[in-house]
């Protein structure tokens, strides 16, 4: 095969892989966020993601001796 054919094939493969990557990324980004049921289950298991309340005086973490 001539050099021009090899270069054309390499460019074609690069273009196809770039297009496939862009389509995969866009399809994942277009999915809506988790439904309400999944979100509540996640918050129940992992916590709500809110900031923890401040530590009261005398309740600091210390060694258990």
UniProtKB/Swiss-Prot annotation:
Keywords: Conjugation, Periplasm, Plasmid, Signal. One of its GO terms (cellular component) is periplasmic space. It is found in: Periplasm. InterPro entries: Conjugal_tfr_protein_TrbK (IPR020065), TrbJ/K_C (IPR024475). Residues 1-19 form the signal peptide. Pfam families: DUF2749. To A.tumefaciens Ti plasmid TrbK. This is Probable conjugal transfer protein TrbK. It comes from Sinorhizobium fredii (strain NBRC 101917 / NGR234). The gene is trbK.
